[in-house]
Curated annotation (Swiss-Prot):
Catalysis performed (reactions): a ubiquinone + NADH + 5 H(+)(in) = a ubiquinol + NAD(+) + 4 H(+)(out)
Function of the molecule: Core subunit of the mitochondrial membrane respiratory chain NADH dehydrogenase (Complex I) which catalyzes electron transfer from NADH through the respiratory chain, using ubiquinone as an electron acceptor. Essential for the catalytic activity and assembly of complex I.
NCBIfam families: NDH_I_M
Assigned EC number: 7.1.1.2
Main location: mitochondrion
GO CC annotations, alphabetized: mitochondrial inner membrane
Organism the protein comes from: Osphranter robustus
Quaternary structure annotation from Swiss-Prot or TrEMBL: Core subunit of respiratory chain NADH dehydrogenase (Complex I) which is composed of 45 different subunits.
Name of the protein in question: NADH-ubiquinone oxidoreductase chain 4
Family: Belongs to the complex I subunit 4 family.
Transmembrane region(s): 22-42, 60-80, 95-112, 114-134, 147-167, 194-214, 224-244, 257-277, 284-303, 308-330, 350-370, 375-395, 435-455
UniProt entry tagged with the keyword Cytoplasm: no
Amino acid sequence: MLKILVPTIMLIPLTWYSKKQWVWINPTAHSFLISIASLTLLYHSTDLGYSYSSSFYMDSLSGPLLVLSCWLLPLMMIASQNHLMKEPLNRKKTFLTTLIILQTSLIMAFSSSELIMFYIMFEATLIPTLIIITRWGNQNERLNAGLYFLFYTLTGSLPLLVALLYLHSKIGTLHILTLIMNPKPMELSMPNSILWYACTVAFMVKMPMYGLHLWLPKAHVEAPIAGSMVLAAILLKLGGYGIMRITILTQPITAHVYYPFIVLSLWGMIMTSSICLRQTDLKSLIAYSSVSHMGLVIVAALMQSTLSFMGATALMIAHGLTSSMLFCLANTNYERIHSRTMILARGLQLILPLMCTWWLLASLANLALPPTINLLGELAVIISSFSWSHFSIILLGANTVITALYSLHMLITSQRGKFTHHLYPMKPSFTREHILMMLHMIPLLIISMNPKFILGITY
């Protein structure tokens, strides 16, 4: 594990000692090498995963998320270059350092074997993200968005800390491997049910579940491109990862208390998908689509079957790459027309035809077109939900249709139609942007061709 962690930490001195002309090239190139080295973590040798030391542990659930975290760091650096072009050198270096600290926290969160260490790293991701949103956001509303993000996350996380400390006093350890081997299940009682709610509410806020989602559109819309990418691609997945870890340990209570969460998530998917249909702001539309997709992951994580866990993992990885790519495309539009309003960007297909191709691919991946991994994940969740309750197929079917509608609405509104003449002169698309889109799309296609890379032994 240290082969990933130590080089990532060493990117900080590399950034500060780099000369002006190398300040982007050095960290980006080295972080890309780290991401390639992290691909070895996708090798799954055993059922239970493997423990690197008493502190680090990895299995077929945390491995793909770790690799996704490492893969996105160089992409965030590539995407942010234009946004920070006019900033002084020291501020560029501070920005890169904040990204690297965030990356380190994420790696340690996904690989921690102790639940208290996981909690500390889960909270540690909050500070760099808050700095990125409130310091490098575009509008003045970024301070309000940061406040929402801070208070929602902190309020949700406090019950989790209390619950973990109580669990530790009862069991004597919070080591994941020891807890998995613990033969004594939790008794079905009111205090234990409250304990379950306390454990899961922090992750429901992070996902976010419908009703606790108000911070997400604000944070996404006001964050700079790197902030939007890391929020959509990795930070939301911390919630899904936490639910899947905690609910296994609190059996058999989950099977008795998950009904309101599943019903609210299924209903929330329909509601947020419908909200997407009437959005005019491009980033806001992508943010609400994230809430809709994460509702599906919550449903899958609470089902507790092998198939639903497989679907949740596939959906998290697929959504991480797809939504990050959509935010990058929205950013390329914003850098040219200086507006997030979709109707003002119409007709861009005539001027930037290759960028329109990336828009088409990203939109099709978002609506889960065969044979993408998005479809595999959604099918796995739909099958396991149908076996849980036949009525769920109505809501899941409606959600699939609405997702296709808003994805095509986003594509047609922003790319087709009559070109607006107020957009002259328009900058051409750059090689940097095409490389960025390729690095999102290639992993998605490779995983779609061979899902065993991320699903491991469960597939």
